[in-house]
Amino acid sequence: MELDLTSIAPELQEELNRNVMFTTLETVKGWVRSNSLWPLTFGLACCAIEMMGTGGARYDLDRFGVIFRASPRQSDVMIVAGTVTKKMAPLLRRLYDQMPEPKWVIAMGSCATAGGPYVRSYSVVKGVDQIVPVDVYIPGCPPNPAALIYGINKLQEKIRYEAKTGKQVTNL
């Protein structure tokens, strides 16, 4: 039986206009991916304490669809919080490689973004972007939980935009 849309009653047509949405599969994929982020916690210093605070009742990352995972195979976001030493760099890269695609990285704090106060030390990596590609940088020493939530929101916007347009965003 073929459905003739011209014979729909006006009140039913208005109901359809309010309750039916037309979109593309790419937009839906972007929406789903951005609202179900599962970060791998890679806390190395004081920034990790602030990251743990975002999981508490006051900030509650669950309302954004963010659920912390302990395994890289279950994660799609890596939050690097703290000082990365040259001895820790291969482990960081291995964890990143174990994450399934698509995957994103957030560098949280001055140490993860540029080396922080230990930038002149021979054993400190001068930014985690020398090891893995970083999508969002969150400055601060340490950044507060609200800054991490802002960074996660920016990552969500980036994921939706890239899914919608097919273009890569590199400056966040």
From Swiss-Prot:
Topological relation to the membrane, as annotated: Peripheral membrane protein
GO molecular function: 4 iron, 4 sulfur cluster binding; iron ion binding; NADH dehydrogenase (ubiquinone) activity; NADH:ubiquinone reductase (non-electrogenic) activity; quinone binding
Cofactors (names): [4Fe-4S] cluster
Its EC number(s): 7.1.1.-
GO biological process: aerobic respiration; electron transport coupled proton transport
Binding site for [4Fe-4S] cluster: C46, C47, C111, C141
Keywords, in A-Z order: 4Fe-4S, Cell membrane, Iron, Iron-sulfur, Membrane, Metal-binding, NAD, Quinone, Translocase, Transport
Compartments where located: Cell membrane
Quaternary structure and interacting proteins, as annotated: NDH-1 is composed of 14 different subunits. Subunits NuoB, C, D, E, F, and G constitute the peripheral sector of the complex.
Name of this chain's protein: NADH-quinone oxidoreductase subunit B
Naturally occurring in which organism (per UniProt): Brevibacillus brevis (strain 47 / JCM 6285 / NBRC 100599)
